[in-house]
Swiss-Prot record:
Residues 133-156 are annotated as: Disordered. Transmembrane segments: none annotated. One of the primary rRNA binding proteins, it binds directly near the 3'-end of the 23S rRNA, where it nucleates assembly of the 50S subunit. It comes from Hamiltonella defensa subsp. Acyrthosiphon pisum (strain 5AT). One of its GO terms (molecular function) is structural constituent of ribosome. Part of the 50S ribosomal subunit. Forms a cluster with proteins L14 and L19. Keywords: Methylation, Ribonucleoprotein, Ribosomal protein, RNA-binding, rRNA-binding. GO terms for biological process: translation. The keyword Ribonucleoprotein applies. The modification N5-methylglutamine is found at residue 151. Methylated by PrmB. The lineage of its organism: Bacteria, Pseudomonadati, Pseudomonadota, Gammaproteobacteria, Enterobacterales. This is Large ribosomal subunit protein uL3.
Amino acid sequence: MKGLVGKKLGMTRIFTKDGISIPVTVIEIKANRVTQIKNLDSDGYLALQITTGTKKASRVNKPKAGHFAKANVEAGRGLWEFRVSEQDATVFLGHTFEVSMFKPGDIVDVTGKSKGKGFSGTVKRWNFRTQDASHGNSLSHRVPGSIGQNQTPGKVFKGKKMSGQLGNERVTIQNLEVVRVDVVREILLIKGGVPGAVGKDVIVKLAVKA
């Protein structure tokens, strides 16, 4: 398997032997436990479903509790799925993947849910330029301006950049470098920033474009 699920703990910096400061994101990756193995016969594709972390038994509904019990694993805080090859699909239920799967120098893609910033205008959301502050303009400083053309086409095209929800969406940052792997504390140090707020789940995969 080429990916793991972890929790973003925040950012810090480390120093090289030459005294160069490197900004890093700290990601805690507890053991990822296999809860289901999907195959071509029953599901039409090969994948491993995994969970990580823990969850109070009182907060797990009966279908989920039965699903975890069938795999004989402790209930985790969520379920994630990774497409795998036939060779990787030969593991057994309850098998664990550790942070030691990565090594310093690996290039990874990190996926998470970006911080929600609420309803935002076009200047903040799409980097539109503002209109004149004066010279006859008294009401239209931060408005987007015209959103259409004329009688033809007589509509606003789908995908038009307008005001709306900013953030709170799935984002992937590609080609980040693994700087350090701490197997004892189960943490990964990745150069640069990754999507999401502190404490939120992120998916770390080996880069597809490296």
